[in-house]
């Protein structure tokens, strides 16, 4: 999220939004990568779905393209983690839309959170290294607007429990609360104006298990 590329992540009706344009593009990573450089790379944090899809393109190209990327997701992550009904979606250029498009039931999203709560283990099987999990949920940046910390594709919740979370559109969320042995998922739809109320709600959920 510190690529330095110009980007507008707003989803508000009537705004000039790069993310809306990107999601309608046949080649999402190319659109994001073509944006002008606004800051020196590594110096400025700004949440960008475009950056996520650039990363997905780089990884997909390294693995050998669309089919290889899908096989890696299913064979090395989804199925070992217990995400047996998850479907990754790709754009017309063959890039996994990592920012936005994994179709999955709540159980599978829960399994993803549990994988990180358990340090990369799914039952007795190691799926991700402990080092990767630790790096993912360690603060690397701070979002100036919200004050939240950001790791590697994970947000840090800034609560008393040291929770970390995946934040989706309009309140979708996977929240992991390691000290309480708790992972929970929300798939509701709430407008951004109520984001402070949502954060209070998530904290109340955790408090109920404390």
Model feature map: region roles:
Residues 1-82, 106-110, 114-115:
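Active-site-adjacent helix/loop patches that line small-molecule binding or acyl-intermediate pockets
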Residues 5-6, 52, 93-96, 116, ...:
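Solvent-exposed loop/turn segments at secondary-structure junctions
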Residues 72-137:
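Active-site-proximal binding-pocket segments
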Residues 38-47, 96-103, 166-167, 191:
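Solvent-exposed loop and edge beta-strand segments that line ligand/cofactor-binding
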Residues 51-59, 100-121, 172-188:
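Active-site-proximal alpha-helical segments within enzyme catalytic domains
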Residues 26, 83-90, 133-183:
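Active-site Gly/Thr loop motif
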Residues 168-210:
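Structured C-terminal helix/loop/strand segments within mature extracytoplasmic catalytic/sensor domains
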């Amino acid at each position: 999220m510190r690529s330095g590329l110009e980007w507008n992540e707003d989803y508000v009706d009537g705004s000039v939004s790069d993310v809306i344009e990107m999601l309608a593009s046949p080649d999402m990573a190319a659109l994001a990568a073509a944006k002008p450089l606004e800051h020196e790379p590594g110096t400025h944090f700004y949440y960008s779905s475009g950056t996520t899809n650039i990363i997905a393109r780089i990884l997909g190209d390294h693995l050998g393209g669309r089919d290889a990327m899908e096989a890696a997701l299913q064979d090395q992550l989804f199925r070992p983690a217990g995400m047996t009904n998850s479907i990754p979606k790709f754009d017309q250029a063959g890039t996994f839309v990592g920012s936005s498009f994994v179709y999955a039931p709540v159980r599978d999203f829960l399994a993803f959170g549990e994988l990180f709560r358990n340090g990369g283990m799914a039952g007795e099987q190691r799926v991700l290294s402990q080092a990767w999990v630790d790096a993912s949920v360690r603060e690397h940046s701070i979002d100036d607007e919200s004050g939240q910390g950001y790791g590697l594709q994970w947000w840090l919740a800034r609560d008393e429990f040291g929770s970390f979370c995946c934040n989706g559109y309009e309140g979708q969320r996977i929240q992991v609360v390691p000290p309480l042995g708790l992972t929970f998922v929300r798939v509701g739809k709430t407008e951004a104006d109520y984001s402070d109320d949502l954060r209070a709600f998530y904290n109340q959920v955790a408090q109920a298990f404390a």
